[in-house]
């Protein structure tokens, strides 16, 4: 059974998925788990694979969701993305990192394409 925070997180991922589909993305998979981390959503945006981190917050009482994408979190997402690319034989694929912020009781959605650079996250 999910607690309230987990339920809101799941609802946020569902809202993000609906939004991405409206934006023309094709969802490849959700909650891709690797030994080095998890990717919330992997989607195709035309010819580019997008590794999408979803941040869902009801309020900003714990700060802006943008601030929760720390360098450490970026490194984990990058490692998980590299694992996915290698595991699926797509090591040479064009890829980027997007963030979807789902916020408030109305689940307003903001998409940040190219939210961070994998090379900078590694440093």
UniProtKB/Swiss-Prot annotation:
Domain of life: Bacteria
MF GO annotations: nucleic acid binding
Alphabetized Pfam families for the sequence: UPF0102
Coiled coil feature spans: none
Segment forming the signal sequence: none
Similarity comment: Belongs to the UPF0102 family.
Alphabetical list of NCBIfam families matching this protein: PRK12497.1-3, PRK12497.3-3, YraN family protein
Protein name per its UniProtKB record: UPF0102 protein Dole_2298
Organism: Desulfosudis oleivorans (strain DSM 6200 / JCM 39069 / Hxd3)
């Amino acid at each position: 059974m999910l607690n309230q925070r987990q339920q809101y997180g799941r609802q946020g991922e569902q809202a993000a998925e609906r939004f991405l589909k409206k934006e023309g993305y094709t969802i490849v998979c959700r909650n891709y788990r690797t030994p080095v981390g998890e990717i919330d959503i992997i989607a195709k945006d035309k010819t580019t694979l997008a590794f999408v981190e979803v941040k869902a917050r009801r309020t900003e009482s714990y700060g802006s969701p943008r601030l929760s994408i720390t360098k450490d979190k970026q490194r984990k997402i990058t490692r998980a993305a590299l694992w996915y690319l290698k595991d699926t034989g797509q090591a040479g694929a064009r890829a980027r990192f997007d963030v979807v912020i789902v916020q408030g009781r109305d689940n307003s959605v903001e998409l940040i394409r190219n939210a961070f650079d994998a090379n900078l996250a590694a440093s």
